[in-house]
Amino acid sequence: MENLSERFNVLQDQLMNIYEAAEHTLETQIAHWTLLRREAVLLYYARQKGITRLGYQPVPTLAVSEAKAKEAIGIMLQLQSLQKSEYASENWTLVDTSAETYNNVPEHHFKKGPVPVEVIYDKEPENANVYTMWKYVYYMDPEDVWHKTTSGVNQTGIYYLHGDFKHYYVLFADGARMYSKTGQWEVKVNKETVFAPVTSSTPPGSPGQRDPDATSKTPATSSDSTTRSSDKQSQQADPRRKGYGRRPSSRTRRQETQQRRSRSRYRSQSNSRSRSQSQTRALGATSVSRSSRSPSVTQIRNRRSRSQSRGRGGRGSSTDTTTKRRRSRSSSSNTRKRSQRGERGRGERGGRGKRRDRSSSTSPTPKRSRAGSRSSRQRGVSPEQVGRSLQSVSSKHRGRLGRLLEEALDPPVIICKGGANTLKCFRNRARHKYTGLFKAFSTTWSWVAGDSTERLGRPRMLISFTSTNQRKDFDETVKYPKGVETAYGNLDSL
């Protein structure tokens, strides 16, 4: 206990000497982080032994001490690597090498010269946000070579130059989604307007944007308003256009049913008249006179079923006129039944009945059954089809066998997104520790915009596998670094 307290006091004295000297050398900053690492390790050991206080200093939990020790080790290694570069002779302060500056955007980069950038949304000075643009940014390339670059700002955001590419670490559109109503912002640097109000290029349906039709709509003319009002009235008057909502009352439904029946009767009468007239013209004027009977008689006869008409037709008849009359009677009853079925389906089921009536009236189109396609897929995958599909497999409407056969069409991969140094360290560690759980690793790469040479998003890295089972074993075994995002995918060829 006393020995730990003495060591802790010695570390505190050495840290105070560094703070009082305030030297701007890289060697001093490395010594500072070395002392912080030793302090965190000592506090971790004290907590392990059950000690909760060293003098007047309370001992934090094991998790806090472990996190501080890892952070100190990481920054100390970066400073030691920077010491071997051409920038070791520059002035380095405690602020330049602090954990807050190192972890600020762009993350895990040493930065100097903060410049405030004010972004005003919707032309309201109260609705503003302040970002930090770093004058100089230090980064390491994939070959572990340090580079010093400058930052810039434009209407899109704040970026630093990574070679010939613009790497954005602040996008103003992200803030516009949260703070802006119109999607417009104005950029000011040192209280001077650099870019006039610009509009976000995000889709109109995204958060923080107004509907563009709301401001661009012009008053409609009288004819347009009349047409719209008539359409609304027709929609309200015809309940068949509504596929959902409340159903009308029983009295209203009875009236509508009676109207539909009268319409169907009138249509069946007209159809039967036209058919009977065309048939009886060849036979004579007798059938014409019989086909033009009063509507009441036709309605009564139309209520008879098809079986009754067939039964009547079974009896022998001596004249051709009676036979034609029975045919017209049965055809009119069939027409009435079809129309009643269609009208009843529209009234009771709304949109569904309408769609079914339309589908029954149109000519049938050949369709491939789902069961047939599924059975053909489950027969297997030919060797020449393996690796041809470029789309990821969906889990819907497929069993386990169908999903495995679909996945056999593409070589499986895992795409990792994160920092370039983090991905490289993970690749080197996995190659030695997880041999046999993967096929190959790719180098770190980035997407480039189609209309410029700017890098989009964080660096990527691909991991290929020989089968989905190998990818599953790799994903369940490997522990990915903090901040690394992963996603499954497939490629046509490797």
From Swiss-Prot:
Glycyl lysine isopeptide (Lys-Gly) (interchain with G-Cter in SUMO) cross-link, renumbered residues: K417
Biased composition (Basic residues): 242-252, 301-313, 324-339
Keywords from the named record: Activator, DNA replication, DNA-binding, Early protein, Host nucleus, Isopeptide bond, Phosphoprotein, Repressor, Transcription, Transcription regulation, Ubl conjugation
Bias kind Low complexity: ranges: 221-236, 267-297, 360-382
Region (Transactivation domain): 1-201
Region (DNA-binding domain): 410-494
Pfam family, one: PPV_E2_N
PTM entry text: Phosphorylated. Sumoylation plays a regulatory role in E2 transcriptional activity.
SUPFAM superfamilies per UniProt: E2 regulatory, transactivation domain (SSF51332), Viral DNA-binding domain (SSF54957)
InterPro entries in the cross-refs: E2/EBNA1_C_sf, Nucleotide-bd_a/b_plait_sf, Papillomavirus_E2_C, PPV_E2_N, Reg_prot_E2, Regulatory_protein_E2_N, Regulatory_protein_E2_N_1, Regulatory_protein_E2_N_2
Gene3D superfamilies registered for this protein in UniProt: 3.30.70.330, E2 (early) protein, N terminal domain, subdomain 1 (1.10.287.30), Papillomavirus E2 early protein domain (2.170.200.10)
A cellular component annotation (GO) from this entry: host cell nucleus
Subunit architecture: Binds DNA as homodimer. Interacts with protein E1; this interaction greatly increases E1 DNA-binding activity. Interacts with protein L1; this interaction enhances E2-dependent replication and transcription activation. Interacts with protein L2; this interaction inhibits E2 transcriptional activity but not DNA replication function E2. Interacts with protein E7; this interaction inhibits E7 oncogenic activity. Interacts with host TAF1; this interaction modulates E2-dependent transcriptional regulation. Interacts with host BRD4; this interaction mediates E2 transcriptional activation function.
Protein name per Swiss-Prot or TrEMBL: Regulatory protein E2
Organism: Human papillomavirus 12
